[in-house]
């Protein structure tokens, strides 16, 4: 019997902990499907080297690994203190100075990177620093100076992040630095570009236009981490290829108690529009220092899988943690365990009824057939990965083997739940010849065996985008050939 494979995908953030020789190979063997390059840290040349190392390691290990470039975005930060940090006490006055000429900070004031902050706040607003560990309440705005009262005791150090409780900051998602970086990551050849702090569909459209101007066809990831993004969720999802539930800054702005419901809402909205969705932030945070996760972390990852996420992401756990490979291994075990316990059939009564595209209709018919006939696998010939994405939205019990000759399409499909990208060149083949070749390839790889039933999808005209319009039910013969090639 062929062993069940993990369906939920794993992203791992690269950093100093993954730079040692051999670590990337171990991460990929442990189950990493996509790596994240965080451009908020390090320089572009260093990230370009990591990208090259990823391509080389993936080839050595023999796996498809995508690369996601995460743009810094307009993260608001306080500036530096003369002594590196200060101790603040509840009731103290502490000013924020929005000026390029702000002096080095002390216990009474510090500069802030966003010069428009005084126009975005009003007396009574609460400002959250260092992920909410330090809270200030605005008392008065005097020109470029914001006078605040400290709400809790604590230590504040250099360059900590700043959020406004409830959102409402007006700065756009794409900074000049982000626009420059899009050109850089286009030259690196990344597969995904993540837009931080997006507010609306226009932010995503602007990023796409810049990427296309550089000849870049990377999939765009919208990071949902602002209150405004929740208000404009549907339009952002529509304008995105991938959606990320970025729980860090989102939790700071809206409050932790709202996060569980919003995570489910974002995942549901993404799946409804046939978009890939990632769940991120502190999923196995304790494994930065511990070789095993906490039980709460295990349940968090498992519940994200049950919610329907395509992928779960590791941040500091792999970038700077003491146990990067163990963190991936733990994530893989948790995902597989959750999938075994909570695999459900598609409710076709609740599925879309006004399909406009042939490939979407074929995807739905394929899933209906796979559930009612009992197939071992779904094999989809695809050019861009669109057919595989539609198929994966139905959360099949059978694995989806997405067959294409395009390297970029395979790496983007590496992020899709239930989808396993396969390299196969169908140029010059008829649909029947392609079916036989793909099935034989999977038999040789140990993914199929004699007697397995397979649903096969393709287009009448091979090598044509969006042309999937054919569905076949096959059975693997004793010699590894596909039998029963009659169209349904």
What is the predicted function of each stretch?
Residues 1-488:
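Non-catalytic helical/linker scaffolds that mediate oligomerization, partner binding
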């Amino acid at each position: 019997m062929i062993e069940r494979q993990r369906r939920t995908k794993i992203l791992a953030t690269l950093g100093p902990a993954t730079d040692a020789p051999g670590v990337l190979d171990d991460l990929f063997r442990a189950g990493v499907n996509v790596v994240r390059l965080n451009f908020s840290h390090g320089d572009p040349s260093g990230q370009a080297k990591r990208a090259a190392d990823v391509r080389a390691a993936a080839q050595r290990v023999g796996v498809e690994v995508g690369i996601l470039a995460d743009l810094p975005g307009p993260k608001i930060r306080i500036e530096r203190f003369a002594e590196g940090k200060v101790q603040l006490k509840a009731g103290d006055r502490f000013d924020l100075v929005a000026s390029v000429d702000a002096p080095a900070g002390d216990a009474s004031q510090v500069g802030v990177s966003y010069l428009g902050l005084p126009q975005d706040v009003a007396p009574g607003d609460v400002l959250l620093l260092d992920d909410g560990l330090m809270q200030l309440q605005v008392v008065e705005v005097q020109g470029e100076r914001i006078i605040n009262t400290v709400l809790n005791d604590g230590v504040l150090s250099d360059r900590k992040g700043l959020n406004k409780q409830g959102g409402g900051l007006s700065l756009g998602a794409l900074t000049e630095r982000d626009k420059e970086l899009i050109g850089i990551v286009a030259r690196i050849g990344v597969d995904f570009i993540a837009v931080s702090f997006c507010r609306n569909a226009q932010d995503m459209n602007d990023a796409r236009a810049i990427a296309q101007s550089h000849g870049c066809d990377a999939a765009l990831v919208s990071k949902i981490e602002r209150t405004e993004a929740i208000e404009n969720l549907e339009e952002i999802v529509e304008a995105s290829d991938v959606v990320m539930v970025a729980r860090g800054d989102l939790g700071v702005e809206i409050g932790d108690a709202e996060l569980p419901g919003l995570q489910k809402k974002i995942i549901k909205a993404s799946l409804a529009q046939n978009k890939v969705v990632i769940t991120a932030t502190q999923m196995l945070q304790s494994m930065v220092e511990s070789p095993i996760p906490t039980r709460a972390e295990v349940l968090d990852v498992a519940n994200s899988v049950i919610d329907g996420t395509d992928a779960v992401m590791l941040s500091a756990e792999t970038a700077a943690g003491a146990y990067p490979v163990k963190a991936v291994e733990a994530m893989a075990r948790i995902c597989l365990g959750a999938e075994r316990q909570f695999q459900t059939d598609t409710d076709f009564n609740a599925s879309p009824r006004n399909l406009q595209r042939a490939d979407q209709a074929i995807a739905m018919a394929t899933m209906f057939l796979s559930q009612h006939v009992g197939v071992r696998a779904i094999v989809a010939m695809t050019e861009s990965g669109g057919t595989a994405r539609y198929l994966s939205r139905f959360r099949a019990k059978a694995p989806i083997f997405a067959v294409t000759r395009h390297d970029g399409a395979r790496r983007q499909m590496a992020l899709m739940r239930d989808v396993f990208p396969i390299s196969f060149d169908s140029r010059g083949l008829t649909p029947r010849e392609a079916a036989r070749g793909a099935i034989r390839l999977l038999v040789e790889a140990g993914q199929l065996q004699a007697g397995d039933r397979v649903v096969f999808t393709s287009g009448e005209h091979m090598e044509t985008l969006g042309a999937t319009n054919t569905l076949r039910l096959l059975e693997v013969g004793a010699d590894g050939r596909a039998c029963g090639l009659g169209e349904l």
